[in-house]
């Protein structure tokens, strides 16, 4: 069984607060999730309902049979573009390491995302007093000045998808951290400016038959 400590980092909190503990187990290809609220969280914020599939009371709660991860973690998960990047990275690593490709679960996607650019207000730790997962300086968000390189990488990945082949690892490595946390199907990545302000950069797609970005700018 795998576990994560879940912290809320809402803008109205003075500091991140422990919400509870998320557990994950896969038995014979079937995923099961459990969650237990922190007593301190329930004491201070018991009137705040975070998810319609979790009740605000102490003790372990589980997802219904056949249901995926609890609803309020869904916003923190990558969508089609992010999952494509993470899946292709796993396929390339499996090929390089001469092993079968692992089946990735929502738990794997959750822990595969960079902390700074993760969508939503939840952050995760593997140990209560440890660092937030994927908060290392190595997993940096690229600057705006890298935008042309990121566009080239996204184009190469889309091209490989069209041709039903694996992309080169260098393209995946360039986009998997800044791009895997974002929702939607279009190629995109997180970037920061010189003031460390986070932006979402949407890229042209090989499938576009008009300038989608131009029209989104004015819509």
Give residue ranges: language-model regions.
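Phosphate/dinucleotide-binding and metal-coordinating scaffold of catalytic cores
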Residues: 1-219
């Amino acid at each position: 069984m795998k576990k994560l400590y879940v912290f809320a980092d809402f803008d109205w909190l003075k500091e991140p607060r422990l919400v509870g503990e998320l557990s994950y187990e896969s038995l014979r290809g079937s995923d099961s999730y459990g969650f237990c609220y922190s007593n301190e969280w329930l004491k201070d914020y018991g009137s705040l309902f975070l998810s319609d599939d979790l009740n605000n009371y102490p003790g372990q709660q589980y997802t219904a049979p056949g249901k995926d991860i609890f609803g309020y973690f869904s916003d923190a998960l990558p969508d089609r573009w992010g999952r494509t990047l993470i899946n292709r990275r796993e396929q390339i690593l499996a090929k390089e390491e001469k092993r079968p490709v692992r089946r990735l679960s929502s738990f794997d996607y959750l822990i595969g995302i960079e902390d700074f650019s993760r969508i939503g207000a939840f952050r995760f730790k593997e140990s209560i007093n440890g660092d937030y997962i994927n908060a290392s300086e190595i997993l940096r968000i690229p600057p705006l000045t890298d935008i042309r390189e990121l566009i080239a990488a996204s184009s190469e990945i889309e091209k490989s998808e069209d041709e039903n082949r694996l992309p080169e690892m260098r393209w995946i490595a360039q986009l998997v951290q800044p791009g895997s946390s974002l929702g939607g199907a279009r190629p995109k990545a997180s970037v920061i400016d010189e003031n460390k302000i986070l932006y979402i950069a949407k890229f042209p797609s090989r499938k576009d038959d008009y300038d989608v970005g131009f029209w989104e700018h004015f819509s």
